[in-house]
Amino acid sequence: MFNILKQVSDYAKGSIQAAKYIGEGLSVTFDHMRRRPITVQYPYEKLIPSERYRGRIHFEFDKCIACEVCVRVCPINLPVVDWTFNKEIKKKELKHYSIDFGVCIFCGNCVEYCPTNCLSMTEEYELASYDRHELNYDNVALGRLPYKVTQDPMVTPLRELGYLPKGVIEPHDLPAGSQRAGKRPEEITD
């Protein structure tokens, strides 16, 4: 008889212990159900990157002294720096700077070791494209145009297409009364 009572008491203890474990498991489940979802609907909602996020590199043309430190510290020798030596002022003049983000590993060495701080990491992470050649960013795509943009051969033809509001002085280096390539809105007739 004592054997049966012992079995019943063991069964009751086991049932209570099983209910306790099930209750603990359900409490964890309900805690997770009450939390906000971590998943975001990416194209419509975007998470804000952290302060030190290493995204696309921003380049400032005017600060660069063409020292090529960025090329030497890059593990894959990625930045392409084209420069000429100006004998009059005895300094290097930067002609072209480009980085191929299809190859870049975003280590940040170029930004860290740049002596003039002309390189900086942005929070931009959307670099996807259908053509890998679109990921090769030149000095204009990496940042802003140089101060002497009126002497840039790539920008000069585009400047002639610009329209100036009434009363504004003519653009630099254009003769007065020169024809624009396009028509003003009031010159267009249906």
Swiss-Prot record:
Principal subcellular localization: membrane
Domain 4Fe-4S ferredoxin-type: 55-84, 95-124
Disulfide bridge map: none
Residues annotated for [4Fe-4S] cluster 2 binding in this entry: 74, 104, 107, 110
EC number of this enzyme: 7.1.1.-
Cofactor(s) needed: [4Fe-4S] cluster
Gene Ontology molecular functions: 4 iron, 4 sulfur cluster binding; iron ion binding; NADH dehydrogenase (ubiquinone) activity; quinone binding
UniProtKB keywords: 4Fe-4S, Iron, Iron-sulfur, Membrane, Metal-binding, NAD, NADP, Plastoquinone, Quinone, Repeat, Thylakoid, Translocase
Catalytic activity: a plastoquinone + NADH + (n+1) H(+)(in) = a plastoquinol + NAD(+) + n H(+)(out); a plastoquinone + NADPH + (n+1) H(+)(in) = a plastoquinol + NADP(+) + n H(+)(out)
Purpose of the protein: NDH-1 shuttles electrons from an unknown electron donor, via FMN and iron-sulfur (Fe-S) centers, to quinones in the respiratory and/or the photosynthetic chain. The immediate electron acceptor for the enzyme in this species is believed to be plastoquinone. Couples the redox reaction to proton translocation, and thus conserves the redox energy in a proton gradient.
The protein's name: NAD(P)H-quinone oxidoreductase subunit I
Organism from which the protein derives: Microcystis aeruginosa (strain NIES-843 / IAM M-2473)
Name of encoding gene: ndhI
